[in-house]
């Protein structure tokens, strides 16, 4: 059906993605080889992984108009901006990259007339070779995606005070923005710490939230509502009713609230939570701008990893430090950025496309990276973040401290030896 070998919808997609093969077919049938053509596309088409093969066929796009500020969305979804582009078939070697001049930036809300004269066009750098890490990017012990503990207004708490009373977090997406956050009391046995990508700084975990979850008392690897006390049972029934009422996708086979939270065993796969695993567990943010932030969860031994984060249980603390050091190394910034699934998401790609060697205890280089990482971790923990609001500002403060101390230079020197084909050359 799809001889172009482009994406037509994932395994669990609710509909077939026909836009990509439709454009390919229309151009082949109705346009000559060098004809220009224009399309309204979701902005994700410029970077997202499902459009990768499509971009290989039509690699050059000229932006005609940014339609993201239109009051009526052209494509479904609460945040699906789109653009009007034109393009033509070109050879891979003719591709271009657009960037702002050094030291300048072009605001996302800038008009095209303002942005166009400031854009510098250049040939793209050669792509980094792609090869999955062993065992971090594939196999039974690879990095795993965190759970999907949503909606926040039903099951997530910012702070859990000592008096036992709580109010859930206000959701900010979809119909859940209209849902009044639930509140309750006396559920301390069912409230568990949670870490997400937003808690990751380089070499440091900052803050946490709490989730209301029915962890089984009889089987430490499962969730079970029926085993919980009456107070929890009443709360969960109320949450279940709200879940069905506000469920954004209206369909007959709506999963229960627990089934939604346990999507692909996101929570139970992490159970049982053991204190001994804390120093061996590595976590990094699955989405963000350009920067990957990795840290050990040493001070949060019983925290469940939530969405927007990937985690890995290392065999020992040295391996965990080694991984954190490699993932935070500034010299891998370009390779990690190039590996992204889309403009927003890293997903598993930093370890799926960059061949990080498996940790070898007897390797002097691996041991040196782990030791430098330990020093970075100590400095990151001591860095004063008082008065700094927002993750970007806190991240910059930690990076500045590591750079000024010379630790980043030492880390880069070691990682360049480890991954010479993926590290940026020293200026």
Q: What is the predicted role of each segment?
A:
Residues 30, 34, 44-45, 58-66, ...:
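A generic secondary-structure signal for well-formed alpha-helical elements
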Residues 355-427:
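Non-catalytic DNA-recognition/assembly elements of restriction-modification systems
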């Amino acid at each position: 059906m799809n001889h172009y070998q482009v994406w037509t919808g994932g395994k669990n997609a609710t509909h077939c993605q026909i836009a990509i093969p439709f454009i390919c077919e229309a151009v082949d049938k109705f346009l000559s080889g060098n004809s220009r053509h224009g399309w309204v596309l979701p902005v994700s088409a410029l970077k997202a992984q499902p459009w990768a093969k499509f971009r290989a066929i039509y690699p050059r796009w000229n932006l005609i108009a940014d339609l993201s500020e239109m009051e009526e969305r052209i494509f479904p979804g609460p945040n699906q901006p789109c653009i009007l582009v034109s393009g033509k078939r070109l050879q891979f070697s003719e591709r271009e990259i657009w960037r702002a001049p050094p030291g300048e930036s072009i605001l996302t809300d800038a008009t095209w007339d303002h942005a166009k004269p400031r854009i510098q066009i250049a040939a793209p750098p050669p792509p980094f070779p792609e090869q999955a890490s062993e065992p971090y990017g594939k196999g039974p012990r690879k990095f795993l995606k965190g759970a999907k503990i949503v909606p926040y207004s039903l099951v997530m708490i910012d702070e859990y005070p000592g008096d036992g009373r709580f109010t859930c977090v206000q959701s900010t997406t979809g119909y859940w923005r209209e849902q009044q956050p639930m509140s309750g009391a006396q559920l301390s046995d069912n409230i568990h710490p949670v870490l997400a990508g937003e808690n990751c700084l380089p070499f440091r975990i900052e803050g946490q939230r709490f989730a209301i979850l029915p962890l089984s008392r009889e089987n430490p690897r499962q969730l079970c509502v029926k085993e919980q006390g009456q107070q929890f049972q009443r709360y969960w029934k109320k949450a279940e009713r709200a879940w069905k009422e506000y469920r954004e996708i209206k369909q007959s086979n709506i999963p229960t609230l627990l089934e939604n939270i346990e999507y692909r065993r996101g929570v139970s796969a992490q159970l049982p939570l053991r204190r001994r695993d804390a120093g061996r567990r590595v976590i990094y943010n699955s989405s963000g701008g350009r920067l990957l932030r990795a840290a050990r969860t040493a001070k949060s031994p019983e925290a469940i990893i939530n969405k927007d984060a990937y985690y890995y249980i290392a065999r020992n603390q040295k391996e965990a430090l080694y991984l954190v050091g490699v993932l935070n190394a500034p010299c891998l910034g370009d390779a990690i950025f190039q590996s992204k699934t889309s403009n927003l998401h890293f997903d598993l790609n930093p370890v799926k496309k960059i061949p990080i060697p498996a940790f070898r205890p007897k390797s002097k280089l691996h041991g040196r990276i782990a030791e430098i990482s330990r020093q970075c971790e100590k400095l990151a923990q001591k860095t004063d973040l008082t008065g700094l609001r927002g993750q970007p500002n806190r991240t910059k403060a930690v990076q500045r401290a590591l750079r000024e101390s010379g630790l980043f230079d030492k880390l880069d020197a070691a990682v360049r030896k480890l991954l010479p084909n993926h590290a940026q050359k020293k200026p």
